[in-house]
A protein has these predicted regions:
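Basic, amphipathic alpha-helical patches used to engage nucleic acids or provide basic targeting signals
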Residues: 116, 120-148
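Active-site metal-binding core of divalent-cation-utilizing nuclease and nuclease-like domains
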Residues: 15-18, 77-112, 117-124, 153-155, ...
Length: 249
């Protein structure tokens, strides 16, 4: 779903600020867009104006857009993005024939923020990290772990075995996640890169808890749970870390 476009002067225009009948251009493929922001049943968005000459280009662009739509459509995802200025949302990056659209880009920090509510493949997770890192940007992910209920569990300190006891550090909490769930999302990532940071949010009795994954242990050779050693962050500290000051931009 396309929420931003360029006017003929090169200005980025959010869909809610677009005018019917005005010419807009797609940031990704450069072809014409029309604003669809008059209805109330669907989320407002831009759509490509059919162009026979550029049909293949538009088809590929729509395919990329459709891949993003499931995540964008969630109220959870939109509520996070809307905390940032419009010029920092849905920022398009191109390198060679590769095109990615960041949920949020903080140029002063050289950081990309990705909000992940729906499931993501490990291939997509690694592709985005590799792409943004190749441009010199760090990536901070926030995953909605409420969507993984039943696939991971908190380990109380009284239940630490010898293995966990060897790795846990003061101030850390430990979660176990079944290996299939972990690998399908993160692949072989184990929190070793200084340019890829993964946080997750979970809700309990309407309270939000934020955790930063510090260390991941477990062997992919054996069918055993992965252990996530995390630092829990106060909400204010977490919001500051992703560029939201005092809870608001």
């Amino acid at each position: 779903m396309i929420l931003f476009a360029l006017d003929l002067a090169g200005n980025r225009i959010y869909i809610e600020n677009a005018h019917a009948g005005t010419a807009y251009l797609c940031e990704e493929c450069g072809t014409r867009l029309m604003a669809k922001n008059k209805g109330s049943e669907r989320q407002h968005h831009y759509a490509h104006v059919p162009d026979e000459k550029n049909r293949g280009i538009q088809r590929d662009c729509k395919w990329r857009s459709d891949l993003r739509t499931e995540n964008q459509m969630s109220e959870w995802h939109r509520s996070w993005q809307e905390r940032y200025p419009e010029n920092q949302r849905e920022v398009v990056f191109k390198k060679g024939d590769r095109i990615f659209r960041a949920d949020v880009f903080l140029p002063e920090r050289r950081e990309v923020i990705e909000f992940q509510h729906s499931r993501i493949t490990s291939e997509d997770f690694h592709a985005r990290n590799e792409f943004y890192n190749s441009l010199g940007y760090s990536v901070i992910w926030l995953f909605d772990f409420d969507e993984l209920e039943g696939r991971y569990q908190y380990i109380h300190p009284d239940q630490y075995d010898d293995f966990v006891q060897r790795f846990v550090r003061d101030g850390q909490k430990v979660y176990a996640m079944d290996q299939d769930t972990y690998r399908s999302t993160f692949g072989d990532w184990k929190a070793k890169s200084k340019k890829v940071h993964v946080c997750f949010m979970r809700t309990y009795n309407q309270w939000r808890f934020y955790s930063y994954i510090k260390v991941v242990t477990g062997s992919f050779k054996y069918d055993m749970p992965m252990h996530l050693f995390v630092i829990e962050m106060k909400e204010r500290d977490f919001l500051s870390r992703i560029g939201i000051n005092n809870g608001y931009r």
